[in-house]
Amino acid sequence: MTAVEYSPEIAKVYAQLYPQDTVVVGDAVAYLEAHYAEFDFIWTSPPCPSHGQYRHNVGVIGKGFAPIMPDMTLYAQIVFLQHYAKGKWVVENVKPYYEPLVKPTFEMQRHLFWSNFEVAPRKFDKADIRHKNKISDFDGHEIVAASKIPNKRQALRNCVDAELGLHILTAAMA
């Protein structure tokens, strides 16, 4: 397993939690472009704040935040992997406030996924994250707690549930 993290603080916590994994500190997009052919399976989750319904509906419309342009890295990674990756891959992001520019392969929980393999639909017990109020209620809370992200609960709400991630990985390895 190889994780690419831009933040040295988050990478350090990740490495402590998962000592068997390789942790690379750097630009995930540049790493993907340079190393995609080395992996049997790729999971990428480009930054989502500029796409999310929450920022658009609550922030821009509800609170008057300035709109920001969507980060097109999401679609660049999808197109790149569609045309160059030989192994299995999945790109994950939150449901956007607009119609996706590339049709997702599947949708589960609060996420859209683009992939080159099928994943069977499934419901998960932990799907209702609205009832998680403390940071420690979330899987992965140690990593986000180490970050400089101001709204840690919101960041964790956007993470993929561990059971869902395992379901997708199992489908990729089938």
Region locations from a protein language model:
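Conserved active-site and SAM-binding loop architecture
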Residues: 1-174
